[in-house]
Amino acid sequence: MGIFVWRSSLSMTNIRWLHHRCLSLYNSSHGFNEAKIKKKLAQFTGGSVDLSKSDDGIAEICINNPTRMNAFTGTMMIELEERISDLENWQDGKGLIVYGAENTFCSGSDLNAVKAISNPQEGMMMCMLMQNTLTRLQRLPLVSVALIQGKALGGGAELCTACDFRLMTEGSEIRFVHKQMGLVPGWGGAARLIHIVGSRHALKLLSGAPRVQPENALELGLADNILTGTEAGVLSEAKNWIMPYIKGPSDVTRAVKKVIISGREQNLEDALRTEKEIFGTVWGGLANLQALAKGTKHK
């Protein structure tokens, strides 16, 4: 009985922590009016953000607006937030692949929407919405991969930094073009980029806006692999690449991702406590007991 109560207490503590992590960065106390900016963005239609989930625990998000190089319209920004909400509630999920329709990743924001929200107040509202969404994407208890075909420009480059891994195809490129537009990243891309490549390389990528091709991205640590398959088969190749990282029970894979999130976002003492709590949710669990019975530690 004592063990059950202890495990239940750990589970509740973990649930509270996860709920806190899923909370948005911005709310009304920061001057963020989500309903107002969504109403504004809803005027700019076109494209879609499509979500599919499979029985093997892998979800796919497709940025689908190929006539505009998969740029985000206003309704697509809203849809992305809704898709992330869906994934937050998907208890069987282990992995996520984000890609763009028709062999290009994403070219950032659609200019029609950008021009219509050109004043600083509405621009900051859009910024807060997308930072909320991409931070929640990064915090999902899923191993996430951005599959980059063609171009990842501006906001598209920022989107790929919200994933755990980035796979690039031959001939693709990542480019932070914000400076050429008289801007800096606003969807959290700069902060995430520094964590990925370091401040020195991040400064070069943001101030010089170079075209980062696959080989260079590998050297920088911005990409994790270069896929060489055909355009038709590259999504399957990405699935094969992610499989070793999500093999096994979903609760264990999700626990691994959770300790990574806590280690990245919390101070050391809090991260250690969170790790202990998450450890308690899998210790003595079915997967742990089966592994002990099989003696699989060194196999």
Swiss-Prot record:
<protein>
    <recommendedName>
        <fullName>Ethylmalonyl-CoA decarboxylase</fullName>
        <ecNumber>4.1.1.94</ecNumber>
    </recommendedName>
</protein>
<keyword id="KW-0963">Cytoplasm</keyword>
<dbReference type="GO" id="GO:0005829">
    <property type="term" value="C:cytosol"/>
</dbReference>
<dbReference type="Pfam" id="PF00378">
    <property type="entry name" value="ECH_1"/>
</dbReference>
<comment type="function">
    <text>Decarboxylates ethylmalonyl-CoA, a potentially toxic metabolite, to form butyryl-CoA, suggesting it might be involved in metabolite proofreading. Acts preferentially on (S)-ethylmalonyl-CoA but also has some activity on the (R)-isomer. Also has methylmalonyl-CoA decarboxylase activity at lower level.</text>
</comment>
<dbReference type="GO" id="GO:0016831">
    <property type="term" value="F:carboxy-lyase activity"/>
</dbReference>
<dbReference type="GO" id="GO:0006635">
    <property type="term" value="P:fatty acid beta-oxidation"/>
</dbReference>
<dbReference type="GO" id="GO:0004492">
    <property type="term" value="F:methyl/ethyl malonyl-CoA decarboxylase activity"/>
</dbReference>
<keyword id="KW-0456">Lyase</keyword>
<comment type="similarity">
    <text>Belongs to the enoyl-CoA hydratase/isomerase family.</text>
</comment>
<dbReference type="InterPro" id="IPR018376">
    <property type="entry name" value="Enoyl-CoA_hyd/isom_CS"/>
</dbReference>
<dbReference type="InterPro" id="IPR001753">
    <property type="entry name" value="Enoyl-CoA_hydra/iso"/>
</dbReference>
<dbReference type="InterPro" id="IPR029045">
    <property type="entry name" value="ClpP/crotonase-like_dom_sf"/>
</dbReference>
